[in-house]
C-alpha cells in the first residue's frame, strides 16, 4: 500500500508566501525558504511552490527563490507558475525542483505536456487543474482562477493523463481558503476517471478533513492551516495513522 502524502503549499507573490480565500484577498504569511525548511522538519512529504502571479503578469517564475528553496530541503519540490515552454520546464528542474506543475499553459498548448513528459519523464510533470462548480458540472479555470475555459474537468483530467502527466494537482476554487473541507465529490469523480495520482487541494480546515479526502486522493495539499499553526503536520500524521491511513512518519 502506497503511503498517503501530506504536502504544504507555498503560494508565492513578490518573493513572499501569501494566502487568500477563493484565490483573492492575499495576506502575507512569511518567507518561502524558511517555511519550506520548517515544513520538512515537521514531517512534510513534499513541498509545492506556486508563483501565483507569474502567468497573469506575463513573466517567468522567480528562479532565485526556487533555487534557494530547493537548496534547504531534501524532500521533493514541485514548482508551478508562469511555465510556458520546454525551456521553462528545463530551467526549473535545473534549479533544483523535482517536478513542475503546468496549469494555464497545458490548456493553451497541450503539446507542452507531452513534449515535457517525453523529455523529462512523466514523474516530473504535474498538471494543475483549478475547478469551479457551475450547476451540476465542474469546469476548468485558468489564469489564477480568473478565466473559465468551458472545459469539463473530468474530460480534461482524462486528456492530461493521455498527454503524459504523471500526476494531477486538483484545486477547488470554491473551497480555496474557506477551511470548509475539501471538495470530496469532484476529487472522487476524477480519481475514478484516471490511473495517475491525485493531489487534492482547497478547503482544509480541520484534521478530520484530511481523513475524508485521503479516502479518495493520493495526497492532500494545504496552505493556510499549516501557515497559521492550526494543524501541525506531525500531529496530523499521527491522527491519520491511528485512523488506518498509511503515512510516512
From Swiss-Prot:
Q: Name one GO molecular function term.
A: lyase activity
List the record's Gene Ontology CC terms alphabetically. cytoplasm
Per the Swiss-Prot or TrEMBL record, the active site comprises 11, 130
Give the chief site where it resides. cytoplasm
Q: Which residues form the signal peptide?
A: none
Keywords carried by this UniProt record: Amino-acid biosynthesis, Cytoplasm, Histidine biosynthesis, Lyase
Q: What is annotated about its quaternary structure and interactions?
A: Heterodimer of HisH and HisF.
GO BP, one example? L-histidine biosynthetic process
Q: What protein name does the entry list?
A: Imidazole glycerol phosphate synthase subunit HisF
Which transformation does this protein catalyse, written as a reaction? 5-[(5-phospho-1-deoxy-D-ribulos-1-ylimino)methylamino]-1-(5-phospho-beta-D-ribosyl)imidazole-4-carboxamide + L-glutamine = D-erythro-1-(imidazol-4-yl)glycerol 3-phosphate + 5-amino-1-(5-phospho-beta-D-ribosyl)imidazole-4-carboxamide + L-glutamate + H(+)
Q: What does this protein do?
A: IGPS catalyzes the conversion of PRFAR and glutamine to IGP, AICAR and glutamate. The HisF subunit catalyzes the cyclization activity that produces IGP and AICAR from PRFAR using the ammonia provided by the HisH subunit.
Q: Which family does it belong to?
A: Belongs to the HisA/HisF family.
NCBIfam families noted in UniProt: hisF (TIGR00735)
Can you say where in the cell this protein is located? Cytoplasm
Top-rank EC class of the record's enzyme: lyase
Pathway participation: Amino-acid biosynthesis; L-histidine biosynthesis; L-histidine from 5-phospho-alpha-D-ribose 1-diphosphate: step 5/9
Its Enzyme Commission number(s) read 4.3.2.10
Amino acid at each position: 500500500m502506497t503511503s498517503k502524502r501530506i504536502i504544504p503549499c507555498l503560494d508565492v507573490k513578490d518573493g513572499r508566501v501569501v494566502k487568500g480565500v477563493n484565490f483573492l484577498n492575499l495576506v502575507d504569511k512569511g518567507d518561502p525558504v524558511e517555511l519550506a525548511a520548517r515544513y520538512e522538519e515537521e514531517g512534510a512529504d513534499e513541498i509545492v511552490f506556486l508563483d501565483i502571479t507569474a502567468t497573469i503578469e506575463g513573466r517567468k517564475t522567480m528562479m532565485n527563490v526556487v533555487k534557494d528553496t530547493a537548496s534547504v530541503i531534501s524532500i521533493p519540490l514541485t514548482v508551478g507558475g508562469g511555465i510556458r515552454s520546454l525551456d521553462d520546464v528545463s530551467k526549473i528542474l535545473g534549479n533544483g525542483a523535482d517536478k513542475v506543475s503546468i496549469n494555464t499553459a497545458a490548456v493553451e498548448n497541450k503539446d507542452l505536456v507531452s513534449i515535457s513528459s517525453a523529455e523529462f519523464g512523466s514523474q516530473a510533470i504535474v498538471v494543475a487543474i483549478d475547478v469551479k462548480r457551475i450547476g451540476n458540472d465542474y469546469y476548468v479555470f485558468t489564469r489564477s482562477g480568473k478565466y473559465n475555459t468551458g472545459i469539463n474537468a473530468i474530460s480534461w483530467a482524462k486528456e492530461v493523463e493521455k498527454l503524459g502527466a504523471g500526476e494531477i494537482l486538483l484545486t477547488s476554487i470554491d473551497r480555496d481558503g474557506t477551511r470548509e473541507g475539501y471538495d470530496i465529490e469532484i476529487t472522487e469523480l476524477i480519481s475514478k476517471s484516471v490511473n495517475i495520482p491525485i493531489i487534492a487541494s482547497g478547503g482544509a480546515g480541520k484534521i478530520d478533513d484530511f481523513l475524508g479526502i485521503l479516502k479518495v486522493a493520493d495526497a492532500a495539499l494545504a496552505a493556510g492551516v499549516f501557515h497559521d499553526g492550526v494543524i501541525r503536520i506531525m500531529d496530523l500524521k499521527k491522527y491519520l495513522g491511528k485512523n488506518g491511513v498509511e503515512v510516512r512518519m
